[in-house]
Amino acid sequence: MANIKSAKKRIKVIETKTLRNKMLKSSLKTTIKNFLTVVEGKNVEEAKAAYKTAARALDMSVSKGIVHKNKAARTKSRLAAKLNALNA
């Protein structure tokens, strides 16, 4: 356990940020799963809206430092491929 006052504060701050990051990561995964279930339902219009939501969530998580930009780009690419396969 830390003895220095600033170290104790850092521990509290890190716990808070960890909880926030877990919450945001969880909601991101839920958004992606929602898109995948809509794609399974083969509804093109709903899938487009769900893709837009998922892509926006990925971009937001990159800007907040929760997901690496390359991982977000790769995930968006895979989701877009599924959307395009649904359109074809």
From Swiss-Prot:
Protein name as annotated: Small ribosomal subunit protein bS20
Keywords assigned: Ribonucleoprotein, Ribosomal protein, RNA-binding, rRNA-binding
InterPro entries for the chain: Ribosomal_bS20 (IPR002583), Ribosomal_bS20_sf (IPR036510)
Disulphide bridges: none
PANTHER family referenced in this protein's UniProt entry, alphabetically: 30S RIBOSOMAL PROTEIN S20, SMALL RIBOSOMAL SUBUNIT PROTEIN BS20C
Listed Pfam families: Ribosomal_S20p (PF01649)
GO MF annotation list: small ribosomal subunit rRNA binding; structural constituent of ribosome
HAMAP family: Ribosomal_bS20
GO CC, one annotated term: cytosol
Similarity section: Belongs to the bacterial ribosomal protein bS20 family.
Keyword RNA-binding assigned: yes
Functional description taken from the UniProt entry: Binds directly to 16S ribosomal RNA.
Domain of life: Bacteria
Species lineage: Bacteria, Bacillati, Bacillota, Clostridia, Eubacteriales
One GO term (biological process): translation
